[in-house]
């Protein structure tokens, strides 16, 4: 059992035991004793004089092993030759000191103790097993109440609680032996031991069939789950109460001598000491037959000390040490960021690494980095030693060490040899995505700073203001190979988030390229003609022609057939020099660079070169344009002075106009024509417009081309060049320097009405300066907080998606999703071609109106195909998606499509889940780190009208309009759309037209681009009369339902609807306005219903009681929320909210069926709305809506499945339940993308789909049928299918269930792997659950494998594991055959006495043999 770990003195490493799964379960007392090497009887640790461990104490050498290698405690046996001898004097076995890390001890408890995890971790497992409440349990355990265990023939019941007095009385009444009642953990243990699990389970199932109501079945199901898990796992319930406590090995709770004779010790020793002390005292008290009350108190204290050892602070007071600091218990060792899981198992420190400051290395190639000689010498020491020895320069390691320390010249030569083609990895913290670690070839440099290639800065998000980076050396050949092939910076040109190049010039380089490609009128040498590129260069060098002159030149190009041809171009010398760097390729013509290059264009050029000319060419090209960009920027000498910021002359007139406008608004407000909110909104709008005008004027004057004396065009303004090229700065920043600073936001996001009119060049007034501090300070504090939030979001995403790996080529699924262009407010934000690029088609795409197949099903769409499809005017395509993939584990390659970072089909073994999590999480951090550059300047201004974005013919969809007195057309419909069609009838734009919108166009009218289509009031939502008549107020009682609000400033009064439910008699009221005709009869609408307008809270009435109302008049207005500034601050929590699948506070109510709206009888403070199905009038679905909420549908309206009955954000769960998976996916993708798009961040849809797939893994059981699944349980789709297949094979009823959406935190905690869940959050709860259920971890995901110390089953790790498994199987066959031979031989030989055979030959199961080396 406890054999020595090392079998061979010369091979101290025992053969590795391979395993396929890890099971965790409760330990029985026998199991604990089998681990133990002896009982610990004394609380002493070591003798303070001799520093030797005390015998039978917490560090006892006899139990745990020797302190020095191969030496017993008293020193009688020393050295290897006595290996395995047990010293008869001190009882210590002579062996390695290392065994003190693995040998355990135990403590025999004088009285049983409940394990706090199973007692207090909710739901309490002991409580569920015994069907007792936690309070009752604690009363029994902490000796306050007795519990009846065996009622006998008395009137008592099993599990009844009794106080001490009641117990005495009962004994008097029934006699001493008539019943059994007990107190403390013994009682609980007896009750648990008495449970017959199978009978209990049958009983519970029977109860469940009869149970009615809401809570009862839930409770029974909870108990049944626990009982079942005990049955399946083979655990016994009484093991939740401990009689023996294991003691962990002493080296894991060390006692370290400090200088000065003091000791530092682990808290665990303190906690163990407490337990031993109390246990020994209890033993003694029992021997002395002490009074009950004393013994009980001691037992209670023992229970408390064991609780503290397992989980300090979970119950009662926290036990503190000498310095008032809480002691770290066993649970605390595992929990949290500093616990075992996250600190030591998931993140380890590594050797062969160093760190230093980084500086730029513009003369490096893309695959190189500069490594300081000193660092290289230290990092590559072992390699240098071995080379020195191989070359015969040193005979021993010691000599080699001396040589290296003296830094002899031959050492440097050898260092050069060693680092040749030995890549090193550079890493910059925070590593937000996989491009944060890349491999480079080191180049030795003088100095102490690492040199980094400028082009990889954007991938590392590095700058040279003092950033540090770490260097790591891959040692083994395999590691070097992987670093070279997979991690080399030249292999990471494209970003995994969106497939765009990430190795892109920035700042100086962009400025240089922009300057090079400028074209100016009237420069020297304009109109010259050149025969070749060389001639141009010659003329430039001779100074005959300017870099920016307009010239004509002949340039070599490649035509379609791959032949070289000469073509003439009108261009400039600068562009020709740039064109000379382009690789010769038909797909990369000179036209690519024959234009003014801004950052976007440069990125596009690199993308084109990478796609069509291959990786090698594009890397060389990048290096060349980097060098050129730097050189030209330096030659151009572009700089920035205060006179480069031009303040437009028209600034003050524009500001004056706006001031007049604002005065008007103030006046209107004083006259009571508009409310304060409207005035605020109008003022804010006026100033935003003014700001835009000033900015336009400034940009106009800065970007205007100027001529000098001799008529040649001057260089553009240098600040304009910087911003326009995309090198640095933005229009917003220029506006603040030379226009006006604009409106500022308060910390809560409201906009301050008074803008900052000055700019930084003029200088701010004191008041303006004070106003601008708000935003600036908020920006800084946000940055700090959001970084943490974003990091946490990434961590949750990684955790939920970590086991999503490409496991197969094709899962063969039939289902797919529809891709359409994403349209936002009538403008296409991402085209169909962007959405289908790199995806696999599920169905053929045909040219509209014909049968011509543009792309067949099953093809991977590349750039050419997507362009073809886009040009053909295809509206939508069906594509494969990770959401619909049917692979058992992970996803299949066909459903995923292209690996964005490589531009080819994704490989099996790619960890797409982690890539998705990083792609979504990384920009979150980026954006939050970048909020403050604009300094809190408000970006806002509401749009109140819409102009045609295309010309064409107007078509209405679901039209419902009404003409009012003034002859204006008002929209009365809820889901009306305005569509603009081109001449072929193709839809060019579509806009949702909201209720109350004023239309300027009619059906069939032709509009030109820029025509005004319709306008609306962005600040209030009107309620419009549909018929004429007299208004009559119902229940609008002054003081209860409406209040007259008098504005102090204007003296005008308005009637505002207030929350009437809070008033004493308010609940009966139904405030509304109805229309009556001259006879006082209600006016009826077309459907024959009376025209009523229920009022919602905060509505402002626009008419008086008994007023005449014409059709189309506004009856009341409901204010909309004011304009808030939008930035990722609102965005990051929004993304988290979406992925956590939280229900929004006032969530929209979605219609579940098609049908007609009917208002039902009202409740106290809820309104009842029913939808009567259009197919089956008896089928109704009811909804409750809080009174006072505005309901956008009226009695008798027809609604379609999926329409909103109440406005707000929909809850994603509802979308899933009503509209299905695809609608949910569309919603999630659009919402998440909207947040990122606002920041200009591109993320591919498939990443979001992968995360949503992980959120949809579980099914909720509706009916259990004849399966073992229970109603309300969440199970994996696989388990669900398996259980149903099992039931059907026995001709039983299958279970019914439906997919549910879990938030990412919930989903990570419910993964199959308990190791992964435990390392994520709520460690104790996860482990408690796992051990009760006897869970097995199959080690499928990445985290589990990292934790148990294996290669991850992705990438090369996945392949290695396959090979290993095959080898293992082969070995097993051979070993079996050998064993059978040996057994046969043994049987032939004479029978030998048993004790002659050594006990350790057959001890290890045979299949644990080391893998074969062939």
From Swiss-Prot:
Sites where the protein binds Zn(2+) 1: 72, 74, 87, 90
Enzyme Commission code(s) on record: 2.7.7.6
Cofactor: Mg(2+); Zn(2+)
Any single GO CC term annotated in Swiss-Prot or TrEMBL for this entry: DNA-directed RNA polymerase complex
Gene Ontology biological-process annotations: DNA-templated transcription
Keywords: DNA-directed RNA polymerase, Magnesium, Metal-binding, Nucleotidyltransferase, Transcription, Transferase, Zinc
Residues noted as binding Zn(2+) 2 in the record, renumbered to the chain: 811, 885, 892, 895
UniProt-listed Pfam families: RNA_pol_Rpb1_1 (PF04997), RNA_pol_Rpb1_2 (PF00623), RNA_pol_Rpb1_3 (PF04983), RNA_pol_Rpb1_4 (PF05000), RNA_pol_Rpb1_5 (PF04998)
Protein name (Swiss-Prot/TrEMBL): DNA-directed RNA polymerase subunit beta'
Record lineage: Bacteria, Pseudomonadati, Pseudomonadota, Alphaproteobacteria, Rhodobacterales
